[in-house]
Regions:
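Ligand/cofactor-recognition surfaces for anionic moieties
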Residues: 1-305
Length: 305
């Protein structure tokens, strides 16, 4: 908490409601306007922000994200708050609570939401952070919502089948389709954020999505990402290399998409299928580094680990 207290996070308007929510309802009704002048208002906001982060993300999340990105605790909390709001995770969690499912099924869905938040938080940390939490949400939420809603129409083959299977599984438990689509997006969250990021450079969202997902199918990106995720991370150095490899794969795809918007998808990453098959045949860390380097070479840049 002291590390957060020493930053300007407690002054961010996005977390100001933590102060009022800390007090009992009767005190909120009578003294809400005076609470911002409470002599411990920064300490209260900090404690609430840290507690909510741990409650929603887990006690080891900060350590893992810090190890992978070098970010401090305040940066991690800012990005996690942005990630949760961009994907509307609070709404899904509220709807899930109202369903009253058994502990096992509830935990399964919550785990998917936690994974989604982790992926999206890491993405924001690697793409400039979220110093302006509200501004980041305003930039990304509309595009992400549009993509999540229409993702089933854009995916093909095994990716489409896996997506639909997950959505059907969740809707059968009682969540509506919009909530189920968010739950099913945990694998795709970094991709969706990357698509919105590129569209913010002046390209129509639909065109970016079509180009990115076409290239993703060509290299079987989800399968490749899972192979990277399965690499060992027992030692800190392994974890850092794996995280760098994962991020480099995302950057390869974003760079390839930017090129495809200019020269067409048929002229970008044409050899991607061979590369992903090679990784699948030998999914160890060194081989993945070499193969992702091949992907990087296809768009004219080098892998940086």
């Amino acid at each position: 908490c002291d590390a957060v207290l020493a930053t300007d996070l407690p002054e961010d308007p996005f977390v100001a409601d933590r102060l009022v929510g800390y007090f009992p309802p009767l005190l909120r009704e009578r003294f809400a306007e005076r609470m911002p002048t409470h002599r411990l208002h920064r300490e209260i906001i900090t404690t609430e922000a840290v507690n909510r982060f741990v409650d929603s993300q887990g006690i080891t999340a900060y350590y893992r994200l810090h190890l992978q990105t070098g970010a401090d605790i305040a940066q991690v909390i800012r990005c996690q708050l942005a990630a949760r709001s961009v994907f509307g995770l609070g709404r899904v969690e509220t709807d899930l609570t109202h369903l009253g499912l058994d502990a096992v099924r509830t935990a399964k869905i919550r785990l998917a939401l936690t994974d989604l938040a982790m992926h999206a938080t890491r993405w924001f940390l690697n793409h400039g952070g979220a110093d302006d939490i509200a501004g980041t949400i305003e930039t990304y939420r509309p595009g992400v919502a549009t993509l999540v809603e229409k993702l089933s129409e854009r995916l093909l083959g095994d990716s489409a089948d896996a997506w639909q299977e997950k959505v059907d599984e969740v809707t059968e438990l009682g969540l509506d389709r919009s909530d189920a689509a968010v739950v099913a997006a945990y694998d795709w969250s970094p991709v969706l954020l990357s698509i919105v990021e590129i569209s913010e450079e002046g390209h129509p969202l639909d065109e970016v999505a079509d180009a990115y997902l076409t290239l993703a199918r060509r290299v079987d990106m989800i399968r490749l990402t899972r192979l990277v995720e399965q690499l060992p991370q027992d030692r800190p150095t392994d974890a850092r290399v794996r995280a760098s490899l994962r991020e480099d794969l995302l950057r390869v795809m974003s760079d390839a998409t930017r090129r495809a918007l200019v020269i067409g998808t048929d002229n970008v990453l044409a050899d991607g299928g061979r590369i992903v098959k090679s990784i699948a045949a030998n999914p160890d860390l060194a081989h993945c580094v070499v193969m992702v380097s091949d992907l990087r070479s296809a768009v004219g840049q080098e892998v940086t680990l």
